């Protein structure tokens, strides 16, 4: 029987929470990102494919929340299913993904401000200016200090952010419907295209041809990371089981919320194809919706969207500042990281995790000055790494299905995992390889945790750590030598990577000795 929690949240409210929580900054740049990769027909097919894959993930998460209530979070599923090392890889990846997403927010926020002061905050190649780096650094440290004071969950802030987010999007949908031209939308609907660009990367023209199956596959492949990025955080949809009035409501809300998000995203990504040509959309610049609404209704529309986006991003950035440290705190509680990471201040905030994360964020905020198209670089990094976490969720359900001999769980878990793995293979493996540099840092801390808790790494863990660390080192050389086209795929060169790696090594050594000292104070010897 489905017991009722009288103080719980009803179905409609659950759906609203899921939708408002999932819509972040990525949706504001969705239209032009997709236009650079796909024609309208390709976008439609891509949404069908991605929607089905995300549905399988949500169903997997929802089943685990209801049937494994003793487990908490994505990394805990990986640990329960495949051991401590895999649980650590998932949790550390979640940490990495969350702060990479924050950097993407920072870049997008400054491109919004650049709408009012063209050329001041963003360079033509998509990198941030020195002034922008200074501004986002101040904002980032300010948000970290706010979270350390325990204000990340203020209801008033969330309400303001929700209004600032939804009003411009509603205006955009209305304007998109009013200005929609069927002839513009249907032109080249099912055709393949080749973009002819100048030295600055601006599309001068598109050359059209009849689309083949391979062409359509290429368009879907090119849209994968952009579309999955706007669903990053969807795991929160399945974590509502203990807050729902009925447990069955959590499952229904997950499905209804996903459908609502798909409708919103499809409208926002397809309506512009009925107002501008694909070439014009691809060249609108960042953030896409700001420039498109400006073209639709005039300057007031662009200003409304830009202001709404800045407020929305600040709110999302504030919430996401806590996400990475929640991951490291949980790893500490599970004894997969040293207890140093779980230490709380008098406000209940994990101060050490916050400061370490902010130091690493600061390093990569500086990198945004050197990286062309910085927004997409960090979007891809964030999305690629979290897809590993999502794949492990599906694999855990698949494993449970085999153990319980439940066919539905076997099928759902397999599809959820296969979708994430295939999407990574076709679109993001280069970023996973690059992320191994940061995993190498994590493995050092994982070993320290083992020391603190009086255990040793197993032979399998030592071998896995060695292999993954070597691959991380090879990634550095791979970028320098442009192995397998890494520089083109990642959008960074060797010198830019050096800007990040050198201070990262310094921070790693500092943290290592601080944590080691903390462990030794407890009387734990080698």
UniProtKB/Swiss-Prot annotation:
One of its GO terms (biological process) is amino acid transport. The lineage of its organism: Bacteria, Bacillati, Bacillota, Bacilli, Lactobacillales. Its main location: membrane. Keywords: Amino-acid transport, Antiport, Cell membrane, Membrane, Transmembrane, Transmembrane helix, Transport. Coiled coil: none annotated. One of its GO terms (cellular component) is plasma membrane. It is found in: Cell membrane. It catalyses: L-ornithine(in) + L-arginine(out) = L-ornithine(out) + L-arginine(in). It is a multi-pass membrane protein. Pfam families: AA_permease_2. Disruption phenotype: Deletion results in loss of the growth advantage observed in the presence of high L-arginine in different growth media. InterPro entries: AA/rel_permease1 (IPR002293), Amino_acid_antiprt (IPR004754), APC_superfamily (IPR050367). It comes from the Bacteria. The chain crosses the membrane at residues 8-28, 41-61, 88-108, 128-148, 160-180, 220-240, 255-275, 297-317, 354-374, 378-398, 407-427, 428-448, 466-486, 495-515. Catalyzes electroneutral exchange between L-arginine and L-ornithine. Can also efficiently translocate L-histidine and L-lysine. ArcD1 is the main L-arginine/L-ornithine exchanger in the arginine deiminase (ADI) pathway. It comes from Lactococcus lactis subsp. cremoris (strain MG1363). One of its GO terms (molecular function) is antiporter activity. The keyword tRNA processing does not apply. This is Arginine/ornithine antiporter ArcD1. Belongs to the amino acid-polyamine-organocation (APC) superfamily. Basic amino acid/polyamine antiporter (APA) (TC 2.A.3.2) family.
């Amino acid at each position: 029987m489905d017991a009722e929690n009288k103080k719980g949240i009803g179905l409609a409210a659950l759906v609203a929470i899921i939708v408002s929580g999932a819509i972040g900054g990525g949706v504001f740049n969705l239209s032009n990102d997709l236009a650079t990769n796909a024609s309208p027909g390709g976008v439609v097919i891509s949404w069908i494919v991605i929607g089905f894959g995300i549905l399988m993930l949500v169903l997997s998460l929802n089943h685990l929340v209801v049937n494994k209530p003793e487990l908490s979070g994505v990394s805990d599923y990986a640990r329960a299913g495949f051991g401590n090392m895999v649980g650590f890889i998932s949790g550390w990846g979640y940490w990495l993904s969350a702060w990479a997403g924050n950097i993407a927010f920072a870049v997008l926020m400054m491109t919004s401000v650049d709408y009012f002061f063209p050329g001041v905050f963003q360079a033509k190649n998509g990198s941030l200016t020195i002034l922008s780096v200074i501004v986002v650094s101040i904002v980032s440290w300010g948000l970290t200090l706010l979270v350390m004071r325990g204000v990340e969950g203020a209801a008033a802030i969330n309400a303001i952010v929700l209004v600032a987010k939804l009003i411009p999007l509603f205006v955009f949908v209305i304007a998109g419907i009013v200005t929609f031209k069927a002839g513009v939308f249907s032109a080249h609907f099912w055709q393949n295209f080749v973009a002819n660009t100048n030295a600055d990367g601006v599309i001068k023209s598109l050359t059209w041809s009849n689309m083949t199956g391979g062409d359509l596959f290429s368009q879907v492949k090119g849209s994968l990371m952009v579309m999955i990025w706007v669903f990053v955080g969807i795991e929160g949809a399945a974590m509502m089981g203990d807050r729902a009035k009925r447990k069955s409501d959590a499952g229904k809300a997950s499905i209804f919320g996903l459908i609502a998000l798909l409708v919103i995203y499809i409208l926002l990504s397809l309506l512009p194809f009925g107002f501008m040509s694909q070439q014009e959309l691809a060249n609108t610049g960042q953030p896409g919706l700001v420039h498109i609404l400006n073209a639709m209704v005039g300057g007031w529309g662009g200003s409304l969207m830009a202001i709404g986006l800045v407020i929305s991003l600040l709110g999302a950035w504030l919430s996401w500042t806590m996400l990475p440290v929640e991951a490291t705190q949980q790893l500490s509680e599970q004894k997969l990281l040293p207890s140093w990471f779980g230490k709380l201040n008098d406000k209940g905030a994990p101060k050490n995790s916050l400061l370490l994360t902010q130091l690493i964020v600061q390093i990569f905020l500086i990198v945004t000055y050197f990286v062309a198209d910085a927004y997409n670089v960090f979007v891809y990094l964030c999305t690629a790494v979290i897809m590993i976490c999502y794949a492990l969720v599906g694999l855990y359900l698949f494993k449970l299905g085999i153990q319980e001999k439940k066919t539905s769980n076997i099928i759902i878990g397999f599809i959820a995992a296969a979708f994430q793995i295939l999407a990574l293979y076709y679109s993001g493996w280069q970023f996973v390889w690059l992320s191994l540099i940061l995993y190498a840092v994590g493995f050092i801390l994982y070993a320290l945790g083992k020391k603190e808790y009086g255990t040793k790494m197993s032979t399998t863990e030592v071998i896995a750590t060695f292999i993954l660390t070597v691959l991380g080192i090879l990634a550095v050389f791979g970028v320098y030598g442009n192995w397998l086209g890494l520089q083109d795929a990642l959008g960074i060169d060797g010198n830019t990577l050096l800007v990040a790696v050198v201070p990262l090594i310094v921070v790693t050594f500092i943290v290592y000795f601080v944590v080691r000292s903390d462990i030794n104070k407890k009387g734990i010897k080698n």
